[in-house]
């Protein structure tokens, strides 16, 4: 008996509940009854909810596995492929669609379209009528998909425009703390869930970890947004804390952002203030733990993740801390004999960078250049967004997406950090002189707060422990080059040096 292989596909997951799949199966069963000299292979290729318009099914779906099986000889010549119609194989542009058909036929695989019982084989490539028919079917399928795609895009474009101009709701889909009103024209917050959100933000502002917050909610039998008790987890809380819908913003997906679709402010009803939301983001985006289990405050590294070794790029760590002794900053690669840079006294570095620069950072920027600081961050945000957009485009053609996805994740984190810094700069400016000098650097809470402020103020600090100098990159765009660490440069001296700044850089 001859072997037949079935391929079934539909484009939208919503079609799963429709008749598309049953119809295709019915056509295959009816054909096999009439053609009793064929048997159906146990392997059936199905792309359920995968579009053929852009060829996704041929890149990552079951159809791509079918093509690989043909090219590697796992499916032998003389096999027949059963499909409902040619548009199941491709809805791409005519040239690409015909090439896919030719690829199958040239490997000795016959194709039978069950809707019209047409047989395509290798001889069909030399028959004008068969080829023209296939081209016309491919052309029609592509045009239908183009029209559907255009209609959907125009529909969503109008919905987004209406949402921007008048706040019209685009879809009933909304965050779990909201619901549609009876008229289906506005979103209404759930009072109990809003109280839960406020509690979570309060706990986070107390600098509790995500696990500690989850434990608190579970211990107090606080229901999650599915109505279940003791079901909170740290990942759910992390996503909630970062959700801009809490301050009324509708955020498009990665891919939508890559196509230039922007956020819609005021789309959802606000349930917390901007100040509270962005204050929590500063905690969330800092790449260090919320609390140190040690009782010795001096073990808290004020420049953690910020200060890097000039020789190898690794983040500097603290060493030989005991009691009230500050110890040293050292490259972690030194103990592994992979970096030969010496350690440097920590008290010298901290005094020069923390007491003189960080505590006076509001003055390390001429008033007339405040706009430039905003522009620097805005340009950085645009550059990061363009990099993300380019990687999103690469995702559609790259065979290995894991590495690209990781790059997008890291860039997105950097983008969010820059966005929070810009928001802080525009809304509150940099913390005032008195705010900084109220910090108690001998206490655990004071040092943790100082560490967060340093992370927010300095983009990075590149330290050369041989020369006892460093390059300091401020988040506002200013750069101090070769800043000395063995002698004290007062804040006033550093501020006075701003008059010699060229292209945002000052050399010491």
Curated annotation (Swiss-Prot):
DNA-binding residues: 175-290
A biological-process GO annotation: DNA recombination
Keyword Kinase appears in the UniProt entry: no
Q: Name one GO molecular function term.
A: DNA binding
- All copies of domain Resolvase/invertase-type recombinase catalytic, residue ranges: 3-163
Task: Name the keywords, alphabetized.
Answer: DNA recombination, DNA-binding
Active-site residue list: 11 (o-(5'-phospho-dna)-serine intermediate)
As a miscellaneous remark, the entry gives:
Encoded by the cryptic lambdoid prophage DLP12.
For this entry, the protein name equals: Uncharacterized protein YbcK
Query: Gene encoding this chain?
Result: ybcK
């Amino acid at each position: 008996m001859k072997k037949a292989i079935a391929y079934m596909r539909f484009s939208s997951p919503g079609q799963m509940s429709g008749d598309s799949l049953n119809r295709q199966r019915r056509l295959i069963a009816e054909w096999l009854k009439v053609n009793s000299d064929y048997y159906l292979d146990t392997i059936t290729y199905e792309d359920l909810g995968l579009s053929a318009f852009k060829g996704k099914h041929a890149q990552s779906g079951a159809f791509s596995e079918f093509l690989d099986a043909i090219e590697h000889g796992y499916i032998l010549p003389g096999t027949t492929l059963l499909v409902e119609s040619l548009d199941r194989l491709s809805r791409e542009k005519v040239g690409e669609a015909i090439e896919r058909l030719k690829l199958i036929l040239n490997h000795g695989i016959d194709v039978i379209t069950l809707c019209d019982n047409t047989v395509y084989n290798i001889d069909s490539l030399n028959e004008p009528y068969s080829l023209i028919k296939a081209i016309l079917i491919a052309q029609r399928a592509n045009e239908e998909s183009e029209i559907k795609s255009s209609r959907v895009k125009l529909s969503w474009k109008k919905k987004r425009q209406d949402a921007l101009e008048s706040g019209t709701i685009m879809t009933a889909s909304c965050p779990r703390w909201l619901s549609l009103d009876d008229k289906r024209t506005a979103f209404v917050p759930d009072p109990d869930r809003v109280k839960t959100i406020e509690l979570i933000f309060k706990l986070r502002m107390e600098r509790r970890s995500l696990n500690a917050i989850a434990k608190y909610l579970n211990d107090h039998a606080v229901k999650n947004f599915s109505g279940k008790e003791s079901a909170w987890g740290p990942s759910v809380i992390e996503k909630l804390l970062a959700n801009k819908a809490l301050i009324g913003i509708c955020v498009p997906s990665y891919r939508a952002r890559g196509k230039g679709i922007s956020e819609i402010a005021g789309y959802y009803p606000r349930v917390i203030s901007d100040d509270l939301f962005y204050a929590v983001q500063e905690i969330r985006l800092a790449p260090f733990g919320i609390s140190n289990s040690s009782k010795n405050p001096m073990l808290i590294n004020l420049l953690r993740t910020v200060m890097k070794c000039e020789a190898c790029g690794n983040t500097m760590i603290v060493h030989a801390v005991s009691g009230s002794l500050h110890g040293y900053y050292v490259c972690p690669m030194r103990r592994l004999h992979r970096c030969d840079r010496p350690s440097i006294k920590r008290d010298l570095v901290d005094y020069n960078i923390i007491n003189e620069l960080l505590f006076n950072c509001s003055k390390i920027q001429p008033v007339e250049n405040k706009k430039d600081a905003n522009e620097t961050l805005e340009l950085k945000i645009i550059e990061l967004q363009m990099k993300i957009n380019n990687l999103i485009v690469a995702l559609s053609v790259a065979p290995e997406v894991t590495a690209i996805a990781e790059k997008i994740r890291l860039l997105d984190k950097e983008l969010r950090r820059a966005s929070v810094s810009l928001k802080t700069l525009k809304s509150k400016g940099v913390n005032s002189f008195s705010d900084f000098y109220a910090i108690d650097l001998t206490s655990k809470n004071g040092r943790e707060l100082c560490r967060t402020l340093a992370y927010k103020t300095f983009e990075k600090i590149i330290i050369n422990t041989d020369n006892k100098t460093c390059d300091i990159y401020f988040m506002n765009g200013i750069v101090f080059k070769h800043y000395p660490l063995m002698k004290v440069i007062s804040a006033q001296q550093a501020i006075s040096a701003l008059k010699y700044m060229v292209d945002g850089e000052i050399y010491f």
